[in-house]
Amino acid sequence: MPRKHFGTDGIRGQANSVITPELAMKVAQATGVLFQRGEHRHRAVIGKDTRLSSYMIEYAMVAGFASVGVDALLLGPMPTPAVAMLTHSMRADVGVMISASHNSYEDNGIKLFGPDGFKLSDEVETKIETMLDAGFALKLSKPADLGRAMRVEGDRARYIEFAKRTLTRSLSLEGLRIVVDCANGAAYKVAPEALWELGAEVISIGVEPDGFNINRGVGSTSPQALVKKVREMRADIGIALDGDADRVLIVDETGKIVDGDQLMAVIAASWKEDGRLSRPGIVATVMSNLGLERYLESIGLTLARTAVGDRYVLEHMRSEGYNLGGEQSGHIILSDFCTTGDGLVAALQLLAVVKRLEKPVSQVCRRFEPSPQVLRSVRVAAGKPLEDASVARAIDLARKRLAASGRLVIRASGTEPVIRVMGEGDDLDLVESIVNELCDIVASSARAA
């Protein structure tokens, strides 16, 4: 049964239209009630990114938590992984990140974490949805039991120290010129500070948030500004985070972009050499490049694939005992340290390899030649074209045409009203032809719905 509010990464939509103060308050009430276990004073940690609507949602959630007797601990602008870490570290009952990640300022969202710092399971989110429809009149606290709200002091320093401790104490980034792009988002203070404290020469862009410019022409989804700055400053490396800093892309010293697949390859090879992999393989999604899979096989590692979404990567990692996984988009999960994707920590693991090998980033990060990959999106206003018999036949035929030389992935987005069609293989012309044909068929089916 399709869910009304929760997608693949919490609740997300246009601020004050989909993500309203009323919805935010009700989500806080439902979550607060659900996680009230034991007789202790209940607490919720709340972080946010820098978009204008985050204030509105934050205050609405404070009201919701307070109304059911839960204290709200306010972090202000902080990366998603910092919220996850601090939720667990501060023994809170629940954590909240107010963010729409890489989306523009018009959107916002709510990500929820349990007391262990992990994102909530589908089952728990479904319980919250059920509670949203049931109402809370009988669950509201008495006046003497209402929750309080308070700002947390020193949270930024705690996260920076946490990130630094993922490296050996003897490692210094001295001698490296690093350009870091914080997307005018949640990491605009912590990322530059952490890199500077580790000894790097830091040049920062995307560190002037105004409520409207998050992800606008900067960050991991718009790396052109970082590419330009790396070349201009003759930097050793560029690090691009997204709006809530749970994903990262790298730019090498030549200005070439290094995606999450290449980054996972570097870390996997390094951890294998050091004996740090908990299993002889890593976890990625169906969207990761075939070249990554072939590279891992060449060094004796396997690639387990999941549905798209870092939560599904993490669920498979936890159930099967992996400690490294991620997505091509730059969500890298290092479960020895983190309970969710952490762009800064992933970048630090790469920098550790660069320092150890004493080679340029371009040499360190080019582990494999990516298979030609074509990704298209078809906007769907209504209907379910993937359930159309003609679309199913076309997909089956396309897979037979690719045979063993490639892959085809067709899926509905969990965050937008689009169907994504991805094809990859050794023959780029064939892949492009197949993807374009499928997009036309899906679009035609959607129009006929």
Curated annotation (Swiss-Prot):
Mg(2+) binds at residues 101, 242, 244, 246. Its cofactor is Mg(2+). Activated by phosphorylation. InterPro entries: A-D-PHexomutase_a/b/a-I, A-D-PHexomutase_a/b/a-I/II/III, A-D-PHexomutase_a/b/a-II, A-D-PHexomutase_a/b/a-III, A-D-PHexomutase_C, A-D-PHexomutase_C_sf, Alpha-D-phosphohexomutase_SF, GlmM_bact. NCBIfam families: glmM, PRK10887.1. The modification Phosphoserine is found at residue 101. GO terms for molecular function: magnesium ion binding; phosphoglucosamine mutase activity; phosphomannomutase activity. GO terms for cellular component: cytosol. PANTHER family: PHOSPHOGLUCOMUTASE (ALPHA-D-GLUCOSE-1,6-BISPHOSPHATE-DEPENDENT), PHOSPHOHEXOSE MUTASE. Binds 1 Mg(2+) ion per subunit. It comes from Methylocella silvestris (strain DSM 15510 / CIP 108128 / LMG 27833 / NCIMB 13906 / BL2). It is an enzyme of class 5 (isomerase). Catalyzes the conversion of glucosamine-6-phosphate to glucosamine-1-phosphate. It holds the Pfam family PGM_PMM_III. Belongs to the phosphohexose mutase family. The active site is at 101 (phosphoserine intermediate). GO terms for biological process: carbohydrate metabolic process; peptidoglycan biosynthetic process; UDP-N-acetylglucosamine biosynthetic process. This is Phosphoglucosamine mutase. Keywords: Isomerase, Magnesium, Metal-binding, Phosphoprotein. It catalyses: alpha-D-glucosamine 1-phosphate = D-glucosamine 6-phosphate. Its EC number is 5.4.2.10.
